[in-house]
Amino acid sequence: MQLRDALEQLLNKHDLTAEQMEWVMQMLMSGQATSAQIAAILVALRAKGETVEEITAAASVMRSLATQVTLTDKTHMVDTCGTGGDGANTFNISTASAFVAAAAGAKVAKHGSRSVSSQSGSADLLEKAGVNLNLTPEQVAECVETVGVGFMYAPAHHSAMKHVIGVRKEIGVRTLFNILGPLTNPAQAPAQVLGVYDSSLLMPFAQVLRELGSKHVMIVHAQDGLDEISIASLTDVAELKEGVITQWTIDPSEYDADHPDLSELKIDSAQDSLNIIHAVLANDHSAAADIVCLNAGASIYVSGVVSTYAEGVQMAKNVIANGQARTLFNQFVEKTQSFA
């Protein structure tokens, strides 16, 4: 098979088999495809619409090429990483939630990078807080095991991405790689809360993660467009638990966390985001604190620390109120600095 054959097939709106897709991905990720070929394949895939089988095959290739973070004990381990691209410019909700979930007993292997489409990516924010991002996989594992949170800076773990990064920037449209990021956690966390930018991705993501072996996952998209669980609208959920996918809805008013809009969550910089997170962890009872609890609650739930989502939300409120989340945030910063 040539890349030209794959391209012809996609242009004729024919899906690729798992084997074909794996071959195509190997070509793209190994530097054997030219920039023009990479762009053509990515655009043709998006125009056709990526299938669950194609996404699963692509994700498994990316996982196999990633620099792994090896954790022997995966009890209560969870990843929080969304697709981004919701255009809402809110503070780093899933990053803040990671520390709250960890304070509640989850082990968070967070995977993220610098901003692509927002004012502040998780890496931008953590750097502002004084976190050392240049850790070896062993040091990341040590953070997860001792503090409860580890941050994997995506470019350091996905070096094969260097072959496609230039093309992604040049074409500037959403492609398969926006979808793959959250599916390729280098620590292979068995549980995950994953926010998506469109409700059409809820079921496909749940199906892909089932194929990839995830145990308990919540894929979320809020009806106001947010790729997080929202305080200003209902949030649609596709939940994968032990092989079964169920769809349900989260209503913030049921958790005393509903607000008229998202205006209090908007930011212009990583510093703004950090200021909001410090206030939340200082127990400021704000709209920001409410959205952190709704999202951390999901991580606490899928990690297996509690048995219902409602218990997860309550536990998130507790560890913020008693200062445990704030203490853990500071411990994490210090731990990463100790490796410098």
UniProtKB/Swiss-Prot annotation:
Its cofactor is Mg(2+). GO terms for biological process: L-tryptophan biosynthetic process. Pathway: Amino-acid biosynthesis; L-tryptophan biosynthesis; L-tryptophan from chorismate: step 2/5. Its EC number is 2.4.2.18. It is an enzyme of class 2 (transferase). GO terms for molecular function: anthranilate phosphoribosyltransferase activity; magnesium ion binding. Binds 2 magnesium ions per monomer. It catalyses: N-(5-phospho-beta-D-ribosyl)anthranilate + diphosphate = 5-phospho-alpha-D-ribose 1-diphosphate + anthranilate. Keywords: Amino-acid biosynthesis, Aromatic amino acid biosynthesis, Glycosyltransferase, Magnesium, Metal-binding, Transferase, Tryptophan biosynthesis. Gene3D superfamilies: Nucleoside phosphorylase/phosphoribosyltransferase catalytic domain, Transferase, Pyrimidine Nucleoside Phosphorylase, Chain C. Anthranilate 1 binds at G82. Belongs to the anthranilate phosphoribosyltransferase family. This is Anthranilate phosphoribosyltransferase. It comes from Hydrogenovibrio crunogenus (strain DSM 25203 / XCL-2). The lineage of its organism: Bacteria, Pseudomonadati, Pseudomonadota, Gammaproteobacteria, Thiotrichales.
